[in-house]
């Protein structure tokens, strides 16, 4: 009740002040337009005497401005004490417009009284403009009291609440990868750094096509790790994009290595620009389990659906058969024919020749006992089905170019050997990825085993477009390679793609064991998963209630997503969110980032223009300068076939001539 009385009293005071303001307005008109009022018959003697006394004692009418100023002062005071109903449509631009118009009409109209249109006409025009100006000033004042000063729609996307301070220090060490950034915080853009001080805890780079994964991050990984003397293995899905960067950067930074590294290329498309390497080199296979790993990798790369069916009979059977063939070639004459093309050719011999030869060796007899039981039990259909499961997919890999590359031994796959460091790039082709991925997957699995050892050179494994190739043992490499100084960087589009091609279990392991995460624009479940990974932060919430008489504002706080999924789904090109890992002696308090990775485009373009193409490695020309590429690789292709035919004939003859083994030959 008391509050209502106070409000009522305040209203009366404001009305009184507005009344005084109107009186000053009328006095101004009466005094300075007196002749017009006299003509109209609106003068009063008592008013004249009062105004004359004011003039003698105060000089109030010595200038036309004084009464106007008093009028505006009291008008302002009356408006300040007025509480109007808040209105969202009233804006400062509208208020300033009417105030400016009011000022012009109210204060800048004195010259109208001197117009040569007669006293009455000039006075009428003056009074009209003065009144119009007063009304405009009154409107502006009332609108100020009705202005909604707390506009909750200024930050419709909650940008301020979701911006946060990020790392601004540059933290370098002998292994680190450092990326300059720009991030938004407290209404301005700031310069910062993403410091991957421990790349051995693995990194993954996600983003839809065109989000800038390779340009902003993967390329920087390659360059900076070469500058710091890493041995390197690069899977280049769109050969030679990454390969040329690695080759040219290595040329300019050979001094970063204690022992000069060699640059090697595996490229099935162009044998001229490819070294030759045998991924199942017998020197690096110590046990039949190594043969099994190789067979497993090949078959799962050729049959991606098998990844989800590991352990099934018709999945394991062809893998075991191929593993037995690889191990046989390893032990036969000290691995003279132990290459993948020889294994394919041997598998394509009739099973009546394959099984007697393989089971004639004691170490393979037990390994192949299920096949022999089926053969001896007359289950020919089952046996043929098992063999066909291996033959059909492997037949897709019969290619002279592939045979050429995989039967040579230009280098070994121990890329981080301190005495022979290497930078190896393997190139795929999107048009032939189903064929090449199986062979390249074999290189991957062998490299993983060879580099994950103690007392080797620091090394890096960079896989662009990971789902295009099945990388056997990748989850184990990520989990165990840190102590062996192996840095893994994986590039792919989103988690659903990884789950589709690697299976749910292996995909989850990869997602949850990687320590450094970069993500450009991703959508759906991937965005939600990342948002949950980045966690929540205390955010301010403001609400407003407006009624006829008053406005009330409430401010509260609540935990909400630091980087919501909707933000991750709408990141612009070059903008990344993520988190990094730190070390015991290099603590990073703010590991999460949401920033634009700064790339000097002009510098990068200049570097790329100066790049040298990867040189010709093998010269396929005759003395008369004619090209003999086709003849050479075809001759190698025929040689592999002939060597297997000869091997089979010799082995069959050996078995027939040995009384203890002769029973293996079924007539």
Q: Where are the model-predicted features located?
A:
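Intrinsically disordered, low-complexity segments enriched in serine, threonine, and glycine
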Residues: 589-591
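Short, surface-exposed recognition loops or helix-turn segments adjacent to catalytic cores
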Residues: 54-59, 339-343, 407, 545-549
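Active-site-adjacent beta-strand anchor residues
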Residues: 15, 235-236, 520
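P-loop NTPase motor domains
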Residues: 148-157, 194-486, 502, 568-572, ...
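Conserved ATP-driven motor cores of ASCE-family P-loop NTPases powering translocation/secretion/packaging/pilus
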Residues: 478-480, 484-581
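Hydrophobic alpha-helical segments involved in membrane association or supramolecular assembly
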Residues: 76-79, 441, 445, 516, ...
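N-terminal charged/capping segments associated with class I S-adenosyl-L-methionine
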Residues: 593-597
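Basic- and hydrophobic-enriched, low-structure N-terminal and domain-boundary segments
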Residues: 1-211, 215, 220, 547-548, ...
